[in-house]
Amino acid sequence: MNFKQAYYEEPIIKDIKSSNTFSLSEQVDESILPENLKRKDLELPEVSEYDVVRHYTRLSQMNYTVDVGIYPLGSCTMKYNPKFADRVSAIDGFRNIHPFQPENTVQGALHVMYDLQEYLKKISDMDAVSLQPMAGADGEFTGILIVKKYFEDKGEDRTEIIIPDSAHGTNPASATMGGFDVVEVPSDDKGMVDLEALRAAVSKKTAAFMITNPNTLGIFEQNIEEIAKIIHNAGALLYYDGANLNAIFGITSPGLMGFDIVHFNLHKSFATPHGGGGPGAGPVAVKSFLKDFLPVPIVDFDGNSYRLNYELKKTIGKVSSFYGSFSILLRAWSYIIRNGDDGLKNVSARAVLNSNYLKKKLEKYYDIPYYPLKKHEFVLSTENTGKRALDIGKYILDNGIHSPTVYFPLIVKEAMMIEPTETVSKADLDNYADVLIEALKLSDEELKSRPKNTAVRRIDEVKAARDLKLKW
């Protein structure tokens, strides 16, 4: 596919001014307000609707999204977001309600939230769910606060959270924000948690072990039941990072594996929108002995009506305003209903199939370390090729498709982490493999000159790191 991305010298919206976009035809009587109370400039729109639409359309043409093509960022599950879910979230009966309305006037919305809680409980084999957290990382931090409050309630001084060396970066960040010290354990030669290292790390100070399964190498932690036994025998909790839940729908579940706390990434596994600083949703599920620690409110049903329950005795309190990101909860609810049990199982089966098909096409050209059987994603290394992962990633962009995650996980040198998801076609996968193979035929000099066809070419990464500009 020939590709040349659009480029505009586009100002930010606040710097755009349209001339003569607003006028008043009527004469306004002289104001009786004293001079010191009069506004000198009226806060009237300065940009016409036409100019606003043009502005954001031009920006979209300089962007890349899941609607444009394959977006195989490892551990991000950049699947296509089905548009029927957008239509559901735009129904007037949902869109026009207000969180301050009496409960008896929003029974439909509460019904949806209750159903979603029940669906997530069933999918994860957990006992209670809060929909409060507004993003995956927010859900993860909420889970850590539950861990903290649980041991405070028991009167136990547990100060450490254990994580594997393949963990997501949010895991140590959330643990640290929660006031815990982070202890890292290494992977074994198969890319799984080293059980002996875990046994050595566990102590009376251990509050929890955080892990995702399959892990960030795309490998299923086959010893998860033994891991659960080690952690629980130490009196600690087992925490499931739901980043890779998309690989196991209908096959196994966090509850069956022995986890005590789970956070869901609705923008990953349940196909709600990614990025842009929001919207997001990261519900948290727990086993029954932790239910009273959940953030409030949760939605209850007494057989006749739905209500918001603020009466959990040991709750960590609220972690967001109102009742979570309702429009995103609607989309996830719609996605689950549309797919059903069999459909969700097929989602995972196709995600695993697509990942292994692409891996098989690339393994003759790139090193794919650790245990050979992969799930929904895999990590290859460019080290054996003499090429840099960064340079190959930039070349991929020049072909109108998105690069994988590069340089993560850190335990693989020159890593490229690839998660195609279930929504891409065989033709997409074949083309992606061809581009990765073609990259190896180019000289280092040619690779370093890429991308040439994107709106933004290579940035000065050293300058960007040293001279941060995070606001206008």
Curated annotation (Swiss-Prot):
It holds the Pfam family Aminotran_5. CDD domains: GDC-P. It catalyses: N(6)-[(R)-lipoyl]-L-lysyl-[glycine-cleavage complex H protein] + glycine + H(+) = N(6)-[(R)-S(8)-aminomethyldihydrolipoyl]-L-lysyl-[glycine-cleavage complex H protein] + CO2. The glycine cleavage system is composed of four proteins: P, T, L and H. In this organism, the P 'protein' is a heterodimer of two subunits. Gene3D superfamilies: 6.20.440.10, Aspartate Aminotransferase, domain 1, Type I PLP-dependent aspartate aminotransferase-like (Major domain). The gene is gcvPB. NCBIfam families: PRK04366.1. Belongs to the GcvP family. C-terminal subunit subfamily. It is an enzyme of class 1 (oxidoreductase). InterPro entries: Aminotrans_V_dom, GcvPB, GDC-P_C, GDC_P, PyrdxlP-dep_Trfase, PyrdxlP-dep_Trfase_major, PyrdxlP-dep_Trfase_small. This is Probable glycine dehydrogenase (decarboxylating) subunit 2. One of its GO terms (molecular function) is pyridoxal phosphate binding. The glycine cleavage system catalyzes the degradation of glycine. The P protein binds the alpha-amino group of glycine through its pyridoxal phosphate cofactor; CO(2) is released and the remaining methylamine moiety is then transferred to the lipoamide cofactor of the H protein. Its EC number is 1.4.4.2. It comes from the Archaea. HAMAP family: GcvPB (MF_00713). PANTHER family: GLYCINE DEHYDROGENASE (DECARBOXYLATING), MITOCHONDRIAL (PTHR11773:SF1), GLYCINE DEHYDROGENASE, DECARBOXYLATING (PTHR11773).
